[in-house]
């Protein structure tokens, strides 16, 4: 692996792409620390301390800490992700978008353009909502977060946050085009990884004051390593369906006749299900934080429901697993259509041995996909619920939740695979000598 890594610097284009990627990520991290005008930073920091474990924490994770500081990049890349998901869902119900999706490169460019428009619209709506919300928020000492409330602040905030999101979106596209890896994913990756030094420092502080024993630290490290190993194993795992292409004679040339496979990932839906599940479960707790405390004291049943929906509670974990499994199936059904796959195979003379091309093939693919999606959903549930159980068991902060680990490991694997592909096409030794994990055939 070391010799493979040294080969990176022997390929000028690959070296240039990696340097460009680091440059754009550095620009992004600088922007995270540029504050939005008109904000009382101390009051905002004290407000966010009491909002831990709510939807704000999830948004802050995807913004790389920018939301907590309310910097110009406070919205992060979430509006772009939301717009992409909405477009994917709309392709199922709107025939025009479905046709665009099947038109190849031109259709894809059109959908990307619509996604950009959607990102700007969502950023403006969210920016206005944040501006209104900030005007009504107070710090722990009762101080105002917004220095001068009014329409001038609202308009300035909308323009600033929308421009920030548009710039992040542009950075992501530039990384994808000129750098290495998926730009949007790498921006989220950089935001999560940037918190590591602070998390390690806080853990060390807990250890030095005696709140964490050496055994607890070792157990947490071992569990982290184990979870990362499981994520790597599952994310690289595939179920490979054998595909045979019939021979075709065109003039004097013979086409087809080769054997290949259709790879089905165990976790087709990625990190979208836990994100959706977390958003739904954190919403009631987020709303409750804006409720007057006297009103909550007058209605103890509301407080008991909120306590049972808090991270780490049994009901929370059960609902979390249920929502993850549901969204795994739902998102897989939206993004992977067995009928389209079977139709494309039939069009190019491909078939799965023992099955008739067309409907029978589609039914078989759907059956296999349904089976492996259950395994993938249970795996995602275990990875995401484990941190909350650890928090309750050891009573220590678990700074990197399951969603964060899934994103970090998944993006790292994807980037390494792209670097390896660049090296292998130029006949250099890759980062990994042996082939990747092979899926079970048939």
Regions of interest found by a model, annotated:
Residues 1-101, 106-442:
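N-terminal cationic and glycine-rich segments that engage phosphates or anionic surfaces
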């Amino acid at each position: 692996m070391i010799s493979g890594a040294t080969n990176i610097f022997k390929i000028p284009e690959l070296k240039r792409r990696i340097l460009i990627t680091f440059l754009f990520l550095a620009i992004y991290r600088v922007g995270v620390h540029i504050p939005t005008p008109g904000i009382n930073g101390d009051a905002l920091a004290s407000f966010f301390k009491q909002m831990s474990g709510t939807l704000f924490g999830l948004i802050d994770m995807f913004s790389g800490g920018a939301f907590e500081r309310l910097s110009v990049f406070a919205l992060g890349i979430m509006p772009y992700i939301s717009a992409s998901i909405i477009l994917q869902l709309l392709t199922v119900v709107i025939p025009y978008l479905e046709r665009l999706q099947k038109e190849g490169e031109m259709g894809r460019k059109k959908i990307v353009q619509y996604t950009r428009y959607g990102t700007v619209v969502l950023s403006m709506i969210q920016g206005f909502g944040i501006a209104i919300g900030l005007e009504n928020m107070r710090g722990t000492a009762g101080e105002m977060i917004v220095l001068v409330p009014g329409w001038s602040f609202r308009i300035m905030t909308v323009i600033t946050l929308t421009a920030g999101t548009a710039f992040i979106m542009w950075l992501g596209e530039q990384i994808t085009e000129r750098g290495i890896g998926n730009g949007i994913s790498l921006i989220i990756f950089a935001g999560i990884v940037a918190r590591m030094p602070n998390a390690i420092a806080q853990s060390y502080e807990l250890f030095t004051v005696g709140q964490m024993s050496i055994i607890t630290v070792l157990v947490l490290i071992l569990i982290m390593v184990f979870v990362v190993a499981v994520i790597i194993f599952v994310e690289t795992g595939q179920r490979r369906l054998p595909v045979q292409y019939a021979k075709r004679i065109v003039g004097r040339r013979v086409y087809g006749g080769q054997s290949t496979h259709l790879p089905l990932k165990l976790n087709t839906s990625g990190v979208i299900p836990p994100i959706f599940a977390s958003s739904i479960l954190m919403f009631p707790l987020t709303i409750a934080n804006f409720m007057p405390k006297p009103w909550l004291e007058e209605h103890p049943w509301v407080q008991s429901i909120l306590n049972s929906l808090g991270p780490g509670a049994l009901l929370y974990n059960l609902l979390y697993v249920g929502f993850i499994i549901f969204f795994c199936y739902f998102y897989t059904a939206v993004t992977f259509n067995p009928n389209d796959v079977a139709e494309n195979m039939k069009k190019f003379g491909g078939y799965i041995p023992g099955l008739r091309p067309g409907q029978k093939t589609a039914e078989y693919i759907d059956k296999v996909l349904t089976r492996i999606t259950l395994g993938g959903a249970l795996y995602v549930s275990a990875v995401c619920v484990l941190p909350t159980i650890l928090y309750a068991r050891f009573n220590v902060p678990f700074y990197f939740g399951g969603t964060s680990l899934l994103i970090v490991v998944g993006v790292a694997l994807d980037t390494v695979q792209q670097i390896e592909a660049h090296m292998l096409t130029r006949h250099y030794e890759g980062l990994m000598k042996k082939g990747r994990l092979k899926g079970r055939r048939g």
